[in-house]
């Protein structure tokens, strides 16, 4: 049974943070068959409609690539220069990100709907980076410990992955 309640995800993700860090170390010390992790991720993705949640849009910064800027400007029917002025800002690490507010998150989020979904940036399209990402899932575990505190897909996948690997909790 998957958990999708965001309050419960936050609470359990924070409660399990130390355990998830131990799980990350556990995965690094052994050789795993990527297929089992991917299969578990595919199952969870199929059970949870990402578009019903949009929590990632509220809590994360979306770093932009040049092609994201080109694509979004074209989608919105404006010049790239205007897009940069109206819809971007500098992130905490100095990178170019989509404009956001602490209260509402991403500038393109309206309730739980992405108003530019068809043209969303590559980082948004690939999120939560379980099925789409560079390297094996175990090699990207550093990303998932924090994401398990706000993303139902990552939280539920991580719990299944612990069961798959017979990780002692």
Predicted stretch roles:
Residues 1-169:
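Short loop/turn segments that flank or connect secondary-structure elements
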